[in-house]
Curated annotation (Swiss-Prot):
<dbReference type="GO" id="GO:0016410">
    <property type="term" value="F:N-acyltransferase activity"/>
</dbReference>
<keyword id="KW-0444">Lipid biosynthesis</keyword>
<dbReference type="GO" id="GO:0103118">
    <property type="term" value="F:UDP-3-O-(R-3-hydroxymyristoyl)-glucosamine N-acyltransferase activity"/>
</dbReference>
<comment type="subunit">
    <text>Homotrimer.</text>
</comment>
<comment type="pathway">
    <text>Glycolipid biosynthesis; lipid IV(A) biosynthesis; lipid IV(A) from (3R)-3-hydroxytetradecanoyl-[acyl-carrier-protein] and UDP-N-acetyl-alpha-D-glucosamine: step 3/6.</text>
</comment>
<dbReference type="InterPro" id="IPR007691">
    <property type="entry name" value="LpxD"/>
</dbReference>
<dbReference type="InterPro" id="IPR020573">
    <property type="entry name" value="UDP_GlcNAc_AcTrfase_non-rep"/>
</dbReference>
<dbReference type="GO" id="GO:0009245">
    <property type="term" value="P:lipid A biosynthetic process"/>
</dbReference>
<comment type="function">
    <text>Catalyzes the N-acylation of UDP-3-O-(hydroxytetradecanoyl)glucosamine using 3-hydroxytetradecanoyl-ACP as the acyl donor. Is involved in the biosynthesis of lipid A, a phosphorylated glycolipid that anchors the lipopolysaccharide to the outer membrane of the cell.</text>
</comment>
<keyword id="KW-0012">Acyltransferase</keyword>
<dbReference type="InterPro" id="IPR018357">
    <property type="entry name" value="Hexapep_transf_CS"/>
</dbReference>
<keyword id="KW-0443">Lipid metabolism</keyword>
<keyword id="KW-0808">Transferase</keyword>
<keyword id="KW-0441">Lipid A biosynthesis</keyword>
<dbReference type="InterPro" id="IPR011004">
    <property type="entry name" value="Trimer_LpxA-like_sf"/>
</dbReference>
<comment type="similarity">
    <text>Belongs to the transferase hexapeptide repeat family. LpxD subfamily.</text>
</comment>
<dbReference type="InterPro" id="IPR001451">
    <property type="entry name" value="Hexapep"/>
</dbReference>
């Protein structure tokens, strides 16, 4: 279990220490579950009333909240960002063994950097290049001529097809498939003719991809995931999609082929986005959004009807179904009124 003196933690976080710097911190916890040795954080003033009951040894908070502190405190401008950084310092995620498992199958032409770890039953095909400190989990497959940059990690059972490029310090969770064929077919009098997908997938640096996500290779041009992109679980990214730097994609999102998304966008969970169009920089699509047309102006966009009691929803649905008829009737009434005037 990691541990650190509160004073040392404050220094690493560039935080202002209030209280005993010799307190030993052994973990991060929520305000409700924290015990002695834990550090917690408060991001909303409405939780001030809970400080009296909180058992944490220290709390991260803003200057405005400091008068309400009942324990040692670290004062910062952004408690949530500080929480992320101290969680990294006190991370308890298991570290892989620094070795290559005897059951791993590695082609003799593969190039391995320094301190590479490869788990049991992993397969590394010919021409693969793994940078320094790369971690390949048990059961992974890395296809011919693919490249994985230094410091990147594949958790167990990740599949990387041939000719894929993954940048430095990336993280890919279990069950994800990168580089499978895109959904490309031509129709010959009712019969589907497969179009070989000869593009690649290019993934930038510091990209994180959740579990069981699929990113298809390009048909001709490449599918591209920019630097700093984060993608949640169970997303489908079709062939030739381009996602700009530092965009965030929540779980269950489906992106159709040849879509281009700008930088610093946020795509809410279960959204569906049409292909062959562009979304500009700094766009937020709220959850379950259905994006059928290009978005050319930054901002927040929503679609759909939020949850309602069933009886209310049925009335709403009936109104929506009849809105065209209602519009025609309204225009007819307007014409009659205008004629009377």
């Amino acid at each position: 279990m990691p541990s650190i003196r509160l004073a040392d933690l404050a220094q690493q976080l560039d935080a202002e220490l209030h209280g005993d710097g010799d307190i030993v911190i052994t973990g991060v916890a929520s305000m409700q579950s924290a015990q002695t040795g834990h550090i917690t954080f408060m991001v909303n003033p409405k939780y001030r009333e809970h400080l009296g009951l909180c058992q944490a040894s220290a709390v991260v908070m803003t200057q405005d909240d400091l008068p309400f502190a009942k324990s040692a405190a670290l004062v910062v401008k952004n408690p949530y960002l500080t929480y992320a950084r101290m969680a990294q310092i006190l991370d308890t995620t298991p570290k892989p063994a620094q070795n290559i498992a005897p059951s791993a199958v590695i082609d003799e032409t593969a190039k391995l950097g320094n301190n590479v770890s490869i788990g049991a039953n992993a397969v590394i095909e010919s021409g693969v290049e793994l940078g320094d400190n790369v971690i390949i989990g048990a059961g992974c497959f890395v296809g011919k001529n693919s490249k994985i940059g230094a410091g990147s990690r594949l958790w167990a059972n990740v599949t990387i097809y041939h000719e894929i490029q993954i940048g430095q310090n990336c993280l890919i969770q279990s069950g994800t498939v990168v580089g499978a064929d895109g959904f490309g077919y031509a129709n010959d009098r009712g019969n589907w003719v497969k179009i070989p997908q000869i593009g690649r997938v290019i993934i930038g640096d510091r990209v994180e991809i959740g579990a069981c996500t699929t990113i298809d290779r390009g048909a001709l041009d490449d599918t591209v995931i920019g630097n700093g992109v984060i993608i949640d679980n169970q997303c489908q990214i079709a062939h030739n999609v381009v996602i700009g730097d530092n965009t965030a994609v929540a779980g269950g999102v489906i992106m159709a082929g040849s879509l281009k998304i700008g930088r610093y966008c946020m795509i809410g969970g279960a959204s569906v986005i049409n292909g062959h169009m562009e979304i500009c920089d700094k766009v937020t699509v709220t959850g379950m959004g259905m994006v059928m047309r290009p978005i050319t102006e930054p901002g927040v966009y929503s679609s759909g009807i939020p949850l309602q009691p069933n009886k209310v929803w049925r009335k709403t649905a009936a109104l929506v179904m009849n809105i065209d008829d209602m519009s025609k009737r309204l225009k007819s009434l307007e014409r009659k009124v205008n004629q009377q005037d």
